[in-house]
Amino acid sequence: MDLNKFTERAKGFVQNAQSVAIRENHQRLLPEHLLKALIDDDQGLAASLISNSEGNVDEIALFLNSLLEKQVKVKGNVQPFADPSFLKVLDEAETLAQKSGDQFVATERLLTALAMVKSGAKEALLSAGMTSQKINSSINEMRKGRTADSASAEDNYQALEKYAQDLTHAAREGKIDPIIGRD
């Protein structure tokens, strides 16, 4: 596993997962921490993939919180160590990226790997009806044939939806004022 093959956002999520483990005083860095970091993302890529796959993000979050509360807590200034299941998720994500023709491991591949590797995170995803196949179909729909060929690949996904307004959709819903005086 080479973290240099991960996109900037994917690296950030791995670091966020470690921060979650430290904040919760957990001894081990688990796939559940990574899934929590993905779901709590302010840009919501993982949450939108889950929603597009007809999954319930709130249900996953509740299940995750109950799993994380059961983890062993340690006192003091202890760095959590990476659990073998966490490392397996990262390896699986790298394998998935290679199979799909990506040069970098993107965030969505981390989510797919979480749905594949046996862990509490997989149980949380399954509790909301999420499978790796559903996530993959959502990824293919979102990417529209593009691959992750740069360290900032996720920034290009759904750029139009992020930075533009769909005036036709807004007009159909009656959210814009009618144009008066049109010739």
For each predicted feature, which ranges?
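Histone-fold recognition with a strong bias for associated Lys/Arg-rich disordered tails
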Residues: 1-183
